[in-house]
C-alpha cells in the first residue's frame, strides 16, 4: 500500500508541476495590442475612421431608426414589440407571463422506489428493509411439501428486515434476528388483511426467509468491508500527502 501511494505521488507531482508553472507564466498581449484602429483610442498611426456617434439616422448611438439605442422599432431598448424592455407581449412588468414554463411535478413512484431498498423502517428500532429478491427453490424432502411450496410461495416474503452487520458478532446471530423479525412482520401484516398461515406455511417461511437472510448478510458484509478498505486507503500517509499537494496546486 505504501509503495502504491509513493508511485501515485510521484506521477501526480510530475504531471501537476508543469501545470502549476504554466499558471504562473505571464501571458503575451492579445490581438492587436499595438494600438487600436478605432476612434478615440489613440493608435500610433492615427485613426483610420472618423469619430462616430450613432449610425445613419441615429441621434444617440442606436441602430437604424433607434432614438435611444434599442433594436429596430424599439423606442426604449426592448425586444421587437417591447415598449419598455420586456419580453414579447410584456409591458416591462410581472404580468402577461402566460408563456412561463410550469414547474416539473415530482414523480412519487420514483420517490417510493428510492426509499424502498435499504431504508430504515420507522417503529422497528433501526431495522432496514432489504431489496426484493427472487424466492429460492427449496426441496422439503417429500412431494406434498414441494408441491405446496410451489403453489404458495407467492404468499411468503420476498424482502427481509435486518440491522447493520457491524452490530452482530457473527453470521448466525444476524440470520437468527433477521428471520424472526421478518416472519413476525409478514405474519402480522398478512393476518391484518384476513389471511392466516398454517403450520406448514410457517415451516416453509422459516426456510425461505433463512436463505434470503443469508444472502442479505453476504451482500451487506461485502459492502461493509469495501467501505473499510476505502477508508484505510485514503487514511494512509502517502495518499494524504498527495491530496494536500494537489489542493496546493489548485489553490495556488
Curated annotation (Swiss-Prot):
Membrane topology: Lipid-anchor; GPI-anchor
Keyword Zinc: yes
Repeat positions for Sequence: 51-58, 59-66, 67-74, 75-82, 83-90
Binding site for Cu(2+) 3: 76-78
Gene3D superfamilies xref list: Prion/Doppel protein, beta-ribbon domain
MF-aspect GO terms: copper ion binding
PROSITE patterns attached to this UniProt entry: PRION_1, PRION_2
Annotated compartments: Cell membrane; Golgi apparatus
Region (Interaction with GRB2, ERI3 and SYN1): 23-229
Predominant location category: membrane
Pro-sequence residue ranges: 230-252
Source organism, top-level taxon: Eukaryota
Biased composition annotated in UniProt, kind: Gly residues: 52-94
Disulfide bonds, paired cysteine numbers: 178-213
Sugar-modified residues: 180, 196
Tagged with keyword Metal-binding: yes
Lipidated sites in chain (GPI-anchor amidated serine): 229
A Pfam family hit: Prion_bPrPp
UniProt record, GO biological process: protein homooligomerization
Renumbered residue ranges of the record's region Interaction with ADGRG6: 23-38
Binding annotation for Cu(2+) 4: 84-86
Function text: Its primary physiological function is unclear. May play a role in neuronal development and synaptic plasticity. May be required for neuronal myelin sheath maintenance. May promote myelin homeostasis through acting as an agonist for ADGRG6 receptor. May play a role in iron uptake and iron homeostasis. Soluble oligomers are toxic to cultured neuroblastoma cells and induce apoptosis (in vitro). Association with GPC1 (via its heparan sulfate chains) targets PRNP to lipid rafts. Also provides Cu(2+) or Zn(2+) for the ascorbate-mediated GPC1 deaminase degradation of its heparan sulfate side chains.
Complex and partners: Monomer and homodimer. Has a tendency to aggregate into amyloid fibrils containing a cross-beta spine, formed by a steric zipper of superposed beta-strands. Soluble oligomers may represent an intermediate stage on the path to fibril formation. Copper binding may promote oligomerization. Interacts with GRB2, APP, ERI3/PRNPIP and SYN1. Mislocalized cytosolically exposed PrP interacts with MGRN1; this interaction alters MGRN1 subcellular location and causes lysosomal enlargement. Interacts with APP. Interacts with KIAA1191. Interacts with ADGRG6.
Domain comment (free text): The normal, monomeric form has a mainly alpha-helical structure. The disease-associated, protease-resistant form forms amyloid fibrils containing a cross-beta spine, formed by a steric zipper of superposed beta-strands. Disease mutations may favor intermolecular contacts via short beta strands, and may thereby trigger oligomerization.
Family: Belongs to the prion family.
Record protein name field: Major prion protein
Amino acid at each position: 500500500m505504501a509503495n502504491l501511494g509513493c508511485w501515485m505521488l510521484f506521477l501526480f507531482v510530475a504531471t501537476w508541476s508543469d501545470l502549476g508553472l504554466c499558471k504562473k507564466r505571464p501571458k503575451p498581449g492579445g490581438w492587436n495590442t499595438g494600438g487600436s484602429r478605432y476612434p478615440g483610442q489613440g493608435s500610433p498611426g492615427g485613426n483610420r475612421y472618423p469619430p462616430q456617434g450613432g449610425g445613419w439616422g441615429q441621434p444617440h448611438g442606436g441602430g437604424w431608426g433607434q432614438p435611444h439605442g434599442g433594436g429596430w422599432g424599439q423606442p426604449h431598448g426592448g425586444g421587437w414589440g417591447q415598449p419598455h424592455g420586456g419580453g414579447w407581449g410584456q409591458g416591462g412588468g410581472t404580468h402577461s407571463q402566460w408563456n412561463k414554463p410550469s414547474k416539473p411535478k415530482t414523480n412519487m413512484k420514483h420517490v417510493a422506489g428510492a426509499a424502498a431498498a435499504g431504508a430504515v423502517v420507522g417503529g422497528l428500532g433501526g431495522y432496514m428493509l432489504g431489496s426484493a429478491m427472487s424466492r429460492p427453490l427449496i426441496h422439503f424432502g417429500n412431494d406434498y411439501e414441494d408441491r405446496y411450496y410451489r403453489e404458495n410461495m407467492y404468499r411468503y416474503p420476498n424482502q427481509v428486515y435486518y440491522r447493520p452487520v457491524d452490530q452482530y458478532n457473527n453470521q448466525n446471530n444476524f440470520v437468527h434476528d433477521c428471520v424472526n423479525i421478518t416472519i413476525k412482520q409478514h405474519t402480522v401484516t398478512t393476518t391484518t388483511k384476513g389471511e392466516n398461515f398454517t403450520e406448514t406455511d410457517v415451516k416453509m417461511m422459516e426456510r425461505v426467509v433463512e436463505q434470503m437472510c443469508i444472502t442479505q448478510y453476504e451482500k451487506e458484509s461485502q459492502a461493509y468491508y469495501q467501505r473499510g478498505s476505502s477508508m484505510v486507503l485514503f487514511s494512509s500517509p502517502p495518499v494524504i500527502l498527495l491530496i494536500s499537494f494537489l489542493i496546493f496546486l489548485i489553490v495556488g
